[in-house]
Amino acid sequence: MSGGSTGERPFSDIITSIRYWVIHSITIPSLFVAGWLFVSTGLAYDVFGTPRPNEYFTQDRQQVPLVNDRFSAKQELEDLTKGI
């Protein structure tokens, strides 16, 4: 004999109901639009602190900011970010 029922609705009943699709026909496109706006307005750059595409290289620093020695990484990072 298998385990007892948890009392929850079967997933097949949920995804075949009209109520499910009425709710999700609004929420799924809304999440897509919200994500698109989050990225296209540049808010994602501000929230996560990543540089915008035109900010990777400044006029003062044109080299690629690479850390070469892992034992002196802190000092190298301080030198790289000194002009920022």
Curated annotation (Swiss-Prot):
Binding site for heme: 24
Cofactor note: With its partner (PsbF) binds heme. PSII binds additional chlorophylls, carotenoids and specific lipids.
Alphabetical UniProt keywords: Chloroplast, Electron transport, Heme, Iron, Membrane, Metal-binding, Photosynthesis, Photosystem II, Plastid, Thylakoid, Transmembrane, Transmembrane helix, Transport
GO BP term, example: photosynthetic electron transport chain
Cofactor names: heme b
PROSITE patterns: CYTOCHROME_B559 (PS00537)
Subcellular localization: Plastid, Chloroplast thylakoid membrane
Main location, first listed in the record: plastid
Molecular function (Gene Ontology), one example: electron transfer activity
Membrane topology of the entry: Single-pass membrane protein
Family per record: Belongs to the PsbE/PsbF family.
PANTHER family in the cross-refs: CYTOCHROME B559 SUBUNIT BETA-RELATED
Transmembrane portions of the chain: 22-36
Disulphide bridges, residue numbers: none
Protein name in UniProt: Cytochrome b559 subunit alpha
Pfam families in alphabetical order: Cytochrom_B559, Cytochrom_B559a
Protein source organism: Gracilaria tenuistipitata var. liui (Red alga)
